[in-house]
């Protein structure tokens, strides 16, 4: 099975899981007493940013211009946007340290307090990174790892003692997963391509992300890329779907 077929089959399987689990949802407010054990959140960025914000970490203080760091709700590339009206969350950076983290985040509410959830992510993004290519520090596709997580506190960058911006969450490092974020694959599209192409990445029901809510039922979603490729990476997030499957109280 080719990589493209694996992505297609994986997306079909995840869509089936989302459809079956969503069928049991009987309330739109997961915090109600009659709340369902399964619910999903869906964010489409084709017209609005839906309150998501972006930032960067793992770079030296004062080097945001040198690293060409840009986040904005921007128009999709022309080959995927024939009428010129479709937008996405765009992140771009020139990784000069062999370790640049680019991320988007959003606060969510309405979770059941002190409850364990199994979470599935379905991330749709646009990338022009080829697979099988050689780059400085790592490959432009396979060495840029997509990660996602749900955490209690707002994910922010902080300045460490070496005057580098680091994350206040455990995201792991490049291929290594962290306590707060799991790997969803790389951003590579296909061999020898430089054309922006839609990419779908997800985890499945066999490897959910485990999260325990706090007293308030509030949390933060974070999605980002951990790069070992020393060069420019530009990505467009078009849609983020998150499914929460309640396991039970702690």
Question: What does each of the following model-derived ranges do?
Answer:
Residues 125-142, 229-232:
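Extended, low-complexity, turn-rich repeat/linker tracts enriched in Gly/Pro/Ser/Thr and Asp/Glu
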Residues 53-84:
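Extracellular glycan-recognition surfaces and repeat-rich motifs
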Residues 188-189, 204-205, 222-231:
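Short beta-strand-plus-loop segments that form exposed binding edges in beta-rich domains
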Residues 163-217:
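Short, surface-exposed tryptophan/glycine-enriched loops
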Residues 24-42:
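Bacterial Sec-dependent N-terminal signal peptides
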Residues 72-103:
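Surface-exposed, low-complexity/disordered Ser/Thr/Gly/Pro/Asn-rich loops and linkers
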Residues 96-111, 201-208, 237:
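Short beta-strands within extracellular/lumenal beta-sheet-rich domains
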Residues 116-132, 223-225:
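A short beta-strand element within beta-rich, extracytoplasmic domains
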